[in-house]
Amino acid sequence: IKASNGNGFYYAVSSAMLGLPVASKAIKVVMEDESFPKTASIIRAIWLAGFPEYARLEAFKRIREMTSSDILALSKLDTYLAIRLATRKYGYGSLVYSAVAFPKPYRDIVERASNTYGISPALIYAVMRQESLFDTYAISVAGAKGLMQLLDGTAQYVARREGIRIKNLFHPETNILLGVAYLRYLLDMWNGDLVRALASYNAGPTRVKDWNSTEDVYLFIETVPIAETRNYVKRVLYNYYVYSDLLK
């Protein structure tokens, strides 16, 4: 039943097991020209007048009247705003209008990080989408920062290991490179076990070492004692399956 609702972790796993494309329900949205649709034009005018925060508030007030073309147009103005609108309107895991809900920003940086650390762009985008919804200036309650949501201590540790200078942790290139380097470190720690690496990215490797030692990855996921981490792993894996299809 859980696998049949058209999106989410169980849907992605069952589709992959059957050799079916996870993103088969994705609908491609194409703007017919470069002009902004009516509602998007109003938001854009407010934004360009120098009131980006008011523009964001106005966008959410008008979300019911927005079409997919409006949201796609706004993605050219602010990726973070567009994906928040898309996930609010269609749901976090919805494959409808995937060009908006599953964007691929910072392609050059992601490709470089992928080549440097041997991690697929699909996985990098999957983590980034869950961590920050592509908000460059995101800050969590715990103090994690940027696109890949790195704590200062973690960022400094990885920077020393990799010889990366941290001028600004909110800088996309710095944040992505450090986040991918840390993910590589965790994957190596767990001998390539993606599920435990993702759990460690969220909850820390020390905690994960104390959890279920089963080799059954699905049993491990379902027995993760922290609900936030359990849901985090499922969402990142779902994102990963979707991006793997979209990037083919």
What are these regions (language model features)?
Residues 2, 7-18, 54, 59-248:
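Catalytic glycan-binding domains that act on GlcNAc-containing polysaccharides
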Residues 30-32, 37-41, 67, 168, ...:
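Alpha-helix initiation/capping motif
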Residues 34-41, 50, 105, 178:
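Alpha-helix N-cap/N′ positions at the starts of helices
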Residues 38-61:
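Alpha-helical segment of the N-proximal tetratricopeptide repeat
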Residues 20-25:
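Short, solvent-exposed, mixed-charge loop/turn linkers that connect secondary-structure elements
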Residues 26-37, 97-101:
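TPR-adjacent "capping" and linker segments in tetratricopeptide-repeat scaffold/adaptor proteins
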